[in-house]
Amino acid sequence: APEGLKARQGKISDEEYANLELVEAPRKASPARGFSFAAEKFNSPNFNKTVYLGRTVTAPNEAGAPAYSYVFFPKGVYNKWHMHGEGQILIATDGIGLHQMKNGEIQVMRPGDVAFCPPGETHWHGAAPNSSFGHIAVSPLGKHTVEWYDFKDIKEYKKNKVKK
């Protein structure tokens, strides 16, 4: 714990967890050569509220690696139905997320889970209604063409609270 503060011990309540205030530690490194670290507020009409986006690896790059972006969805935030022309890979890193392919079942994503969205397949993803969610989005082939559609029905979305 920082000087002058006592470390918290024991389990925290659900209410305490829901009201945690996160503070980003100052960065010692700076982005260089197309690599970035910190996620910044990102507002888009394709998300129902603000998300946080970090361009971790941009493409094209010297290594020939695909583009990697870190996206953090606060509790209850999700995106519109959309389709990636080149496909997309999602790697869950934080919290609990939801992912659904058109005409498919909703899949729960927890840290370490991976979802593959084939080229041309419509899907949506985001935080569960009762949890925040973070993922790394990988855009194969160094391209990233996206077609956006409508939002999933909010009443349907809210039915998907997930046990933590």
What residue ranges belong to the model's regions?
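A short, N-terminal "cap"/entry segment at the start of jelly-roll beta-barrel domains
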Residues: 1-65, 146-164
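Short, conserved beta-strand element in jelly-roll/cupin
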Residues: 70-74, 83-99, 138-141
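Short acidic-glycine-tyrosine-enriched beta hairpin
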Residues: 103-120
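Short beta-strand His + acidic residue motifs that chelate non-heme Fe in jelly-roll/DSBH
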Residues: 79-81, 99-100, 122-128
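Conserved short histidine dyad/triad with adjacent acidic residue
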Residues: 52-55, 67-84, 119
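A short hydrophobic beta-strand segment most commonly corresponding to one strand
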Residues: 130-150
